[in-house]
Amino acid sequence: MKKLLFFCFSILCVISASAQYNITVKIYGFKADTLSLNRFDFEKNKFLVQQNLPYADEVILKGKKSLAPGYYVISADSMDMAAFFISDEKNQKFQIEVWNDMKQFSGSEENSAFLSMKAREKEFDNRLKVLDNEFAEIQKNSLPQYMKQTMVDSLVARAKRIMGEKENYMRELMERYDGTLFASYVQSQLQLPEPPQSCYGNRDLYNIFLADTLLANYPWHDERFLATPFAHNILADYMKVIFYMPQNEAVPRLLKNLRAAQVNETQLYAVFDYFEKMFGSLTSPYRDEKLYIPMLKQMLEYKNLETGRKARYEFELSTIDKNNEGDILPDFPMLMSTGETLSLHQVPAEYMLVYFQNPDCPTCSQVREKMKTMTHLKNAIASGRLKVLTVYFESDESLWRRYLTQKANPDYLHAWNYTLSIETDNLYDTRVIPMMMFVDKDKKVIRKDIPYNDLEPLIQKLGLSK
C-alpha cells in the first residue's frame, strides 16, 4: 500500500512539475524598473500582464501553473525586449538572452526558429530592395524602350525566383514544426497571390480579390492562433474590405469564411463574435445589418450551436430583421402637435423622413442641429415633396410638450406615440436613437436607419432639392 501511495505521489509530482513554467531572461546593457510577461488577448485586442517583477540583468519568470498557449512579449518598463510562442504545456523551461538588437533562445526550438525566420525574411527583403534600386536606375537611363523592357523582364524573373525561395523556405518550416503554434504563424504569413491585371485601377475588383485571398492562409484548425496579434490583424483587414464591398459581393464571401471556421468551434465562435462586434454592435462605426443578418441566419443553421447562443441570435434576429428596404413600415397611432390623432399611414407625403427620438437625448439634439444647416433638406421640405416627422415613443408626455414649445423645428411634423405601441409591440428597433427611416408615399422603406450624413446625398439622388 505504501509503495502504491508513493507511486501516486511521484506521479503527481511529475505532473505538477511538468505544468510549471520557468523562463530565464538575461538582458545586457539595459536598465529599467520592472520586467513584465504579457500575453495577447484576442477579445480585448491587447497584451495583458501575466507577471510583473523588479528589473534585473537576470530574471527568472516562473509560476506553478503552465502558461496558456499563445504569443507572449517580455517588456522592460514600456520597451518590448523579446517575443515568443507557447504551443503547449510542455517545453516551458527555456532561456532568452537579449543584447542590443540581438536575441537568442536556449531550450526552445520553435522560438529559435522564429528568430531565424525573421532574419531570413530580412535577407529576402534586402534582395528584393536591390532589385527595386536596379529598376529605378533603369527608369532613369536613356536606353531604348525595348532594351529597358528586356532588363525589366529580367528583374521580374529574378524577383519571382526570390519569392519562390521564400515560399519554399516557409513551407519547409511549416513541415518541420508541424503541430506548433509557430507553424500556424508561418502558414498565416505565406505570400498571397498577385492580383490580376484587371484589378489595377479598379478598386471594386481589387477589393473582391482581397476578400477572396486575405484569409486563404488563415490557420482555421488552430485555436491557439487566436491568442496572437497576427490573427486579429488579419481579421481586421478582412473586415474592412468586406465592409466597403457591395452587399451582393460581400455577403457570400463573409459566409464562406465563417463556414471555413467551423473546422474548429473555438475559432468559429471567436471569429463570429469579432465580426458581430464590428457589423452588429449598435455603437460600431462598421455596423451593417445587411452583413449582420445573414451571419445570424447562417449561425442559426449550425447544428452544434450552443443553446445560449441560439437563444441570443434568435432574439437579435427578431429585433433587427424587420423594416428592411422595400418593406412597408408598420402603422402606429400618434398624437400630433396640432392635437389631432392620426396614424403614420394617414399622414400624406410623397417622401417622408421618420425621425424616432427622445427630445432630451444629446445625440438627437446634435443631429437636429446639423439638419438645420442642410440646404438640400430644407429645399426638399420647402418644395412640399418631403416631410420630416419626429416621433417620441416613450411615456413622458410633459417632456414631449416642453420639446414642442422650446425645441421643435416649425418646418417639421411632430408626433407622440401615446399608446407606446412602438416599444410594447416591438415595431421598430429603437435601441439606439436617433433612428431615421426614409420612406416613399406608400411608407415603403427606401433607406433603413439612415445616417444623418447620408441624408443630403439621398435627397439629391431622388431629385427632391430642385
Please annotate each region the language model reported.
Residues 1-26, 465-466:
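Bacterial Sec-dependent N-terminal signal peptides
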